[in-house]
Amino acid sequence: MARTMSKTAPKTSAANGSLAPWLGVALIVILFDQLTKIAVQKVFAYGVAHEVTSFFNLILVYNRGAAFSFLAMAGGWQRWAFTALGVVAALVICYLLKRHGGQKMFCTALALILGGALGNVIDRLAYGHVIDFLDFHLRTWHWPAFNLADSAITVGAVLLVLDELRRVRGSR
């Protein structure tokens, strides 16, 4: 009896549901995020802007809230609420990575978001706040300071949108 050959390509470990490649991406994000935060804390005094270009400063600031310092002055409970939210998000993302491991752009996006979320969770647990230091501005108008974890979350979110647009266009 002849064995029939499958016409599909062999599945990669990511396609088989392995979390390892995606957790590796998240770990790289966490490492770069934490190393930059450690360096900034060692080099800069709190709140002192260091001009890099006419539109970009490095400045050590603490964010006790969420994005754009949302709920930063809420009295302390937000530390634990945003930590719990980050942990729940990480668990959901791990489930999605395991379930959709073969979808490279989707999983890359999720891995970036995972790394960013956990980078900020580490800050909340270790310091009670998130360390921010990237300050873009136009004259006197400053975008809220952020960090590499926030950047990874943003890039991941953009990739999710692009992946969905590509998927929808491909199904037409």
From Swiss-Prot:
Keywords, comma-separated and alphabetical: Aspartyl protease, Cell inner membrane, Cell membrane, Hydrolase, Membrane, Protease, Transmembrane, Transmembrane helix
Cell compartments where the protein resides: Cell inner membrane
GO CC terms in record: plasma membrane
Top-rank taxon, per record: Bacteria
GO biological processes: proteolysis
InterPro entries the UniProt entry points to: Peptidase_A8
One Pfam family linked to the record: Peptidase_A8
Presence of the UniProt keyword Cell membrane in the record: yes
Catalytic activity field: Release of signal peptides from bacterial membrane prolipoproteins. Hydrolyzes -Xaa-Yaa-Zaa-|-(S,diacylglyceryl)Cys-, in which Xaa is hydrophobic (preferably Leu), and Yaa (Ala or Ser) and Zaa (Gly or Ala) have small, neutral side chains
EC number in record: 3.4.23.36
One GO MF term: aspartic-type endopeptidase activity
Transmembrane residue ranges: 12-32, 43-63, 77-97, 102-122, 142-162
Keyword Cytoplasm attached: no
Membrane association type: Multi-pass membrane protein
Annotated family: Belongs to the peptidase A8 family.
Function text: This protein specifically catalyzes the removal of signal peptides from prolipoproteins.
Name of the protein this chain belongs to: Lipoprotein signal peptidase
Organism in which the protein naturally occurs: Paraburkholderia phytofirmans (strain DSM 17436 / LMG 22146 / PsJN)
Gene: lspA
